């Protein structure tokens, strides 16, 4: 149990997808204007990462890995296309669910919901799972932890962005300029966790 807790904490704080690896920055910067929208997208990323990482772990272990299907047959060259297909299918299911049951969040996310399919944080989570050779329970914990870390970062940035609306930001830094500086300072803050050994 201790191993899974340390893996979760490590994936949320030490190896944060957005602030340590800078993955998923397109939606991270675009949807960080309001806390409510950022929170909704963060939940969607947790769901997609929490399901796609373990599902892709099963697909990789039982089908794509060298000798998994048939002895001597290596299908690992199909990793990228298979992983993207699984992620796209999960995002489509999530999109239909939100459209049916939470239409306000579906409208608020707009074009960024389908963009989760090509969000490099999602694919990065799956790639790290393969690279680090996580088993199924580890991939579940890692997927949920990585999604939680990404959500924590985007909600924090959205909160800071909402506060900066009332600040006297110099004209040359308004918009993306101050956002990049803020993200850089947040990344420096999260870098302080890198010395922790779990």
From Swiss-Prot:
Subcellular location: Cell inner membrane
EC number: 7.2.1.1
UniProtKB keywords: Cell inner membrane, Cell membrane, Ion transport, Membrane, NAD, Sodium, Sodium transport, Translocase, Transmembrane, Transmembrane helix, Transport, Ubiquinone
Keyword check for Transmembrane helix: yes
Reactions this protein catalyses: a ubiquinone + n Na(+)(in) + NADH + H(+) = a ubiquinol + n Na(+)(out) + NAD(+)
InterPro entries: NqrDE/RnfAE (IPR003667), NqrDE/RnfAE_oxidrdctase (IPR050133), NqrE (IPR010967)
GO biological process, one term: respiratory electron transport chain
Parts of the chain that traverse the membrane: 11-31, 35-55, 77-97, 110-130, 140-160, 176-196
Pfam hit, one: Rnf-Nqr
GO terms for MF: oxidoreductase activity, acting on NAD(P)H, quinone or similar compound as acceptor
One term under GO cellular component: Gram-negative-bacterium-type cell wall
Topology of this chain in the membrane: Multi-pass membrane protein
Class of enzymatic activity (EC top level): translocase
Role: NQR complex catalyzes the reduction of ubiquinone-1 to ubiquinol by two successive reactions, coupled with the transport of Na(+) ions from the cytoplasm to the periplasm. NqrA to NqrE are probably involved in the second step, the conversion of ubisemiquinone to ubiquinol.
Complex and partners: Composed of six subunits; NqrA, NqrB, NqrC, NqrD, NqrE and NqrF.
Family label: Belongs to the NqrDE/RnfAE family.
Name used for this protein in its record: Na(+)-translocating NADH-quinone reductase subunit E
